[in-house]
Amino acid sequence: MKAAVGVVYSRKSSQAIESEIRRFSPDLVHVHNYFPLISPAVFYVCKYLGVPVVHTLHNYRAICPTATFFHKGRIEERSLKESSWWTASKKVYRESYIGSFIVATMVEAHKYLGTWQNKVDRFIALTDFSRKKYIDAGWPESKISIKPNFIEDPFTDRKVFRKTDAYGVFVGRLSEEKGVNVLIDAWKNINFPLKIIGEGPLESIVSNKSADSLEFLGRQDRRSTLDFMRNADFIIVPSLCYETFGVVIIESFACGTPVIASRLGSFETMIEDGVTGLLFEPGSSESLIEKVQWMMHNRNLVFEMGLRARHEYLEKYTPENNYKITMGVYEQAIEEAKGRQW
């Protein structure tokens, strides 16, 4: 019970945060992840002290205990339409009844208390899809801005060039929700080299499936990973869950490499089908095979697609662009907080 109360509202964290805010006197507080240790207590402290607060929505935990709307191999949106208590009996959080109950309690408590309507000045969603999901859950539309993630340009001193080797790349956690099984199933019928970079619970399955056309590289450092991505014909992102963003997508764009991704969630708003990549039906190895074969047989068009992907990165996902949007959100939050009453 003590753990449940701490996740819903941590008195220890609230005292520490209040002390730090009083010491530092910030113009604004920007909260990224509060779960599980800080708890939404941070928003109440900021409200009490009259400090504007911005919160970035990095996942869906605040409206669905699964954090991804993914359960037992499929998308599950019940938490948008009803309470989250159903998740407790399904062990959606770390396969634990108690853990799932605690997270569901947090979701329902702050829904009841109106925390998200009354204690936060501005929210940042990473994509339009993510913003719409929060609005569907009843969050205030007028308070949610869109600001994507960004990465430093990994190749400022090098130009995008024609790929010399022919291969595809998967980079990510090796788990069910990332679509790893779909990828492996598709590659049984694809004669084209694929390099798999990552680690996770399905690692043994992936390593055992390695063959002439499928190479498991395990975990790689960032520089090596980006080099593999830069030289690839395409990157594959076969996720089965709703992701608020796809960092690997903008990494691929920065490398001048197009993306083949599931036609699902935020990916649809990040990838322009046929322009910066291709979209396939989620969970369908047949659809994925079709898109890979198109890439294999149209390498000149794939190169042009990569140039457009690189342009997309420069237009939307650079630190400079991110800074401008962030400052705009901060200014809004400060302005809107000036006249508020608590």
Model-derived regions, located:
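Conserved acidic donor-binding segment of nucleotide-sugar-dependent glycosyltransferases
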Residues: 273-274, 278-285, 292-299
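Donor nucleotide-sugar binding/catalytic pocket of nucleotide-sugar-dependent glycosyltransferases
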Residues: 62, 75-76, 80-156, 216
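Acidic donor-binding loop of glycosyltransferase active sites
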Residues: 230-244, 257
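A short, well-ordered alpha-helix in the C-terminal region of glycosyltransferases
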Residues: 287, 294, 301-316, 322-328, ...
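Nucleotide-activated donor-binding/catalytic signature segment of Leloir-type glycosyltransferases, i.e.
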Residues: 204-227
